[in-house]
Amino acid sequence: MEIFDTHAHFGQAGAETAAVLARAAEAGVTRLVAVGGSEELNAAAIQAQDIRPDAVRLAIGADRDQALLPADEVMSEIRRLHASRRCAAVGEIGLDFHYTPETSSEQCSLFAAQLALADEIGLPVVIHTREADDATRGVLDEVPWHGDGLRGVIHCYTGAPAFARQLLDRGFMVSFSGIVTFRSAEEVRASARYVPDDRLLVETDSPYLAPVPMRGKKNEPAFVVHTVRFLAELRQSREDALAALTFANAVAMFG
């Protein structure tokens, strides 16, 4: 059984990253997306790809926490990294109004600029959205999209089935993290039942959000097996079948 973790972050310590990647391989996680979002996260994701170029796909971007930095400098650096590296996606990008609603305008501008970049260079996007459904939908609808097929993935989905349907209609896949295993996450489970097989992805969002039964531990890609097992039971599927379909979906998106 092969598993594709579509969203993992890494630290700066190369030895630790190598060990995390080795444990992932032992657990059957044969591919993953190392995701950036800041100068530090982008550098760490690049390092992960350098350590395991066969297994690691790379997403480079500027997340909502970079929204108050000089926009021209941020976008220039993102363009430079995409020109110099073999990237599979632009990300993570998007909106989070939970902690910093006061930067909503700047977040939307940075989000839109990177959507336009992804369209220009022909890559999918990895989107974060939290307490920003209307704004996310608005930016997605404002930015022209000239590519064919799927536009990207809404990662670590925590919304209702109704918003998931709107995202699916706009050409996105939907990815579920260990949150779906949490006792309080009934709405997330409803969405996980709703998303069709050909749009479903799985992730860790490590080092955060370790799934049950690993809660309280530092998350890592190897733990995605627990989320796969949980989703298979939730969707009344075999574990190996769910791993296979999410792997195929991820390969179609990221290679």
Model-inferred region functions:
Residues 1-255:
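Mid-domain alpha/beta scaffold segments of enzyme catalytic cores
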